[in-house]
Every structure is written in C-alpha cells, then in structure tokens.
C-alpha cells in the first residue's frame, strides 16, 4: 500500500500546498525489485513507478523519485524526506498508528525462497535455527525471528537472494 500524505486532498489545487516541494509529489521507493520498481537502461521503471506517476498526474503534480534502502524508507517518510512511499509496504498496527495507508493496490503472497535442493524449509516451524537473509525492519524478518530463525541483515531483496544462492543464508 502507498503510505503518506497525512491530509486528504480536497481538490487538486490544494495538493501542491500539502507536499514537501511545491507542485511536486516526492515519492520514496527502493527501486531495486522488479517488477515493482527497478532500473532498466539507467531509467527507473516498474509497476509502482507507473502507478505513482499516474497518481501524481491526477493531482496535477510532477513526480520526483527518491531511491532509498528499505531499512530507512519508512523513517524517511517520518522525517519528511518524501510525501509518500510506493514500495509494497505491509500494514502493521504500529505503522497504522503513525501513518495513513491507501486502499491496497496489491495483495502480495508471502513465500519462503530457498535453494532448489533445500527440502528442509517448508513452513515457519522449519525456520528454527536457520539463517534467514532479511532486512532488519521487514515484517517477515520479525516473523522469522519469532519462529527461531537467525536473521542475517541485508539491505534489500537482491542481497537476500545473493546470500541464499551463495549458501550464506538458508
């Protein structure tokens, strides 16, 4: 879900006065995870880039993207580094107390990603004592830790996948 914009936009002209920079919607995202947001030929692209661009246009604002590592993405919204986050953010009670969430634009299904030959990891119960590559602020990292996993901190999905393929995480 997109989070941010603490005030409802009554009409388009008011939108530019409710943003960090006039006439601009400053958007925080990772930009490292296809098909959501990623770089292709040096240009930021993806589903969340397209969606946030369309929303900015509807508000008569110019989109400005700020790529940020996941672990500091939500904190950046709190410190007014950007107006909104478009980055498949999970809704938690703690986040709901601090931020407004849009209607979900995506329902993601969570799965364990493991090496093809790993037949031991099939459920949360199987995580006990295993090394899991996760962002330190990930909802899934918290869940894995509660299930007894050892968390190997990584900045994002690309690094997590590398840890698994190089057998530095289960």
Predicted regions and their residues:
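Extracytoplasmic small-molecule ligand-binding "clamshell" domains
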Residues: 17-88
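A local structural motif
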Residues: 53, 57-66, 128, 145-159
């Amino acid at each position: 879900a997109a989070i941010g914009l603490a005030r409802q936009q009554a009409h388009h002209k008011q939108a530019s006065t409710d943003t960090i920079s006039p006439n601009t919607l400053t958007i925080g995202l990772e930009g490292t995870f296809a098909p959501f947001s990623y770089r292709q030929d040096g240009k930021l692209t993806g589903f969340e880039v397209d969606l946030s661009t369309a929303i900015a246009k509807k508000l008569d604002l110019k989109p400005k993207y700020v790529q940020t590592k996941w672990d500091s993405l939500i904190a950046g919204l709190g410190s007014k580094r950007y107006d909104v986050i478009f980055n498949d953010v999970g809704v938690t009670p703690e986040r709901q107390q601090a931020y407004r969430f849009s209607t979900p634009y995506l329902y993601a299904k969570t799965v364990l990603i493991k090496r093809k030959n790993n037949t031991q990891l099939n459920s949360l119960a199987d995580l006990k004592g295993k090394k899991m590559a996760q962002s330190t602020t990930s909802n899934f990292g918290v869940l894995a830790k509660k299930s007894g996993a050892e968390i190997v901190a990584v900045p994002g999905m690309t690094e997590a996948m590398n840890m698994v393929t190089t057998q530095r995480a289960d």
